[in-house]
Amino acid sequence: MLILRLTLAGDREALAQKGHFYGVYLLCSQSVDVRHRGKCYVGFTVNPKRRIRQHNRGSSFGGAKKTSKKGPWQMVMIVHGFPNKIVALQFEWAWQQPTLSTRLKIFDDLRRKLPRETHFDYNFRIVNRMLGVGPWHRLPLTVRWLETDYEREFQLPLPRHMRIVSGKVAITTSQRALAVKRTAAAAAATASWSSECHLCMQRIEHPERSRFSCLNASCCLSCHMLCLASYLLDDQPGQYLPIVGNCPLCETPLVWAELLERKRFEQGVQIQGEDENEEEDRDELSDCPDVDSDVEHICELSD
């Protein structure tokens, strides 16, 4: 199984298995034709590196019709961390159609681009607003700058649990090996975990799927996923998805998204035996899950 390497600011690394990465990106045209230069395009992808190649090669190679022959394009930013493909596609549609989105059409300032405002600034203003309203403001999202020339401050502050980082997204063989080592280490650590949940005191069946532990390696917390979620949501009636909280044993700050990411990671990562470059060349034009955003009608999240 492939590993996406996400290079964060400060040399911090995060790992995501292929099949668990869903991103909504913003392209900016660098065309020499003044009719197209500076125009923007919002799309969805499971593989940013491959997707930008498709856009720049044209619609015959998997790129969107709307971007064909209007480039070259730069992927300047991407929002990722969505729990599944459907939620990411809904976010993409709302970003493309703020005047039609139930969540966004109430904001008069998003109805049109302001005089002398660039297409990028307008799209950035839309996504800034989106990240502060429901249901997206509760998601553990990461805003990733891919081109430093476009980086700027958000006028509206983002929720505390969201991250703003810089760096490319790449698939590397070395990260696959690292993933296997970490998985083996996690498996070894489970041997010392309690077989009972610290919160409900019941036996944890199928611990490989349902047992959660603390992010603090020295903490011995062992509990059901649902028990920990209920504990973290104790003071948030009406909510079903935790965001942040503290460990019930050691008070270490916990980020629910990081717990889920680690659980997926611990469930096993297989190393592909074939050469990475050959695999990427073979797959780059058949990105089946990487739906193009020319789709006009996608249902929004229910109110």
Curated annotation (Swiss-Prot):
Key words of the record: DNA damage, DNA recombination, DNA repair, Endonuclease, Hydrolase, Metal-binding, Nuclease, Nucleus, Zinc, Zinc-finger
Cofactor entry: a divalent metal cation
Bias (Basic and acidic residues): 294-303
Lineage, top ranks: Eukaryota, Metazoa, Ecdysozoa, Arthropoda, Hexapoda
Residues in GIY-YIG domain copies: 20-106
Family designation: Belongs to the SLX1 family.
Region entry Disordered, spans: 270-303
Function text: Catalytic subunit of a heterodimeric structure-specific endonuclease that resolves DNA secondary structures generated during DNA repair and recombination. Has endonuclease activity towards branched DNA substrates, introducing single-strand cuts in duplex DNA close to junctions with ss-DNA.
Main location: nucleus
Subunit composition and interactions: Forms a heterodimer with mus312/SLX4.
Enzyme Commission number(s): 3.1.-.-
GO MF annotations in UniProt: 5'-flap endonuclease activity; crossover junction DNA endonuclease activity; zinc ion binding
Zinc finger (SLX1-type): 197-250
Family matches, as CDD domains: GIY-YIG_SLX1
GO biological process, one term: double-strand break repair via homologous recombination
One Pfam family this sequence matches: GIY-YIG
Organism: Drosophila mojavensis
Protein name: Structure-specific endonuclease subunit SLX1 homolog
Annotated transmembrane regions: none
Compartment(s) of residence: Nucleus
Acidic residues compositional bias, start-end: 273-293
GO CC, one annotated term: Slx1-Slx4 complex
Taxonomy, superkingdom: Eukaryota
